[in-house]
Amino acid sequence: MITAVYPGTFDPLTRGHEDLVRRAAALFDKVVVGIAHSRNKKPFFSIDERVEIAREVLGHYPNVEVRSFAGLLKDFVREQNGRVIVRGLRAVSDFEYEFQMAGMNRHLLPEVETMFMTPSDQYQFISGTIVREIAQLGGDVSKFVFPSVERWLQAKAKEYREQSWPAGKG
């Protein structure tokens, strides 16, 4: 049985992420979506919210599990008995960082391969960061995320605007 691990912050989970999970699920016996705690980033959603969102969107795939992790990816991959790390590449700009990370992971986990996947054409431009910014400014994100994710984003963005904008501006 080959287990693939697809790690990320998934803040929020987008249609592009789901596209990669769906395609990875067709290639591997099991796919573990590993949602990172991300101390270095300041996530919009808490780790529990990101896990719940991912489970709502991905729950219908029988061979996909969603788990959170903290610490080194290598430890999480070992805990999951992972043989492959799946990473998405949207553009050439993603490649340099992902290439360096794959090299480091190869040194830390020589028995595990990194597989790069490009999103389907209609999702190549989607970025969780950009989706969050659009939502925070009150824009329509329905083309980039699933309806359940959009509801989460709208509620969180409303809170953000109420806390960040002067009265009468949001």
UniProtKB/Swiss-Prot annotation:
Where along the sequence does the record put site: Transition state stabilizer? H17
Q: Keywords assigned by UniProt?
A: ATP-binding, Coenzyme A biosynthesis, Cytoplasm, Magnesium, Nucleotide-binding, Nucleotidyltransferase, Transferase
Which GO terms fall under biological process for this protein? coenzyme A biosynthetic process
* This protein's GO CC annotations: cytoplasm
Keyword presence, 4Fe-4S: no
The residues that the entry says bind ATP are T9, F10, H17, G88, L89, R90, E98, Y123, Q124, F125, I126, S127, G128, T129
Needed cofactors: Mg(2+)
Which pathway does the protein contribute to? Cofactor biosynthesis; coenzyme A biosynthesis; CoA from (R)-pantothenate: step 4/5
> Is Transferase one of the keywords?
yes
Enzymatic reactions? (R)-4'-phosphopantetheine + ATP + H(+) = 3'-dephospho-CoA + diphosphate
Q: Which Pfam families match?
A: CTP_transf_like
Q: What is its EC number?
A: 2.7.7.3
Provide the binding site for substrate: T9, K41, L73, R87
What subcellular compartments does it reside in?
Answer: Cytoplasm
Q: Molecular function (GO) terms listed?
A: ATP binding; pantetheine-phosphate adenylyltransferase activity
Its biological purpose is as follows: Reversibly transfers an adenylyl group from ATP to 4'-phosphopantetheine, yielding dephospho-CoA (dPCoA) and pyrophosphate.
**What quaternary structure, including any partners, is listed in this protein's UniProt entry?**
Homohexamer.
NCBIfam families from the UniProt entry: coaD_prev_kdtB, cyt_tran_rel
Which family is annotated?
Answer: Belongs to the bacterial CoaD family.
Recorded protein name is Phosphopantetheine adenylyltransferase
Please report the organism this UniProt entry assigns to the protein.
Answer: Bordetella petrii (strain ATCC BAA-461 / DSM 12804 / CCUG 43448)
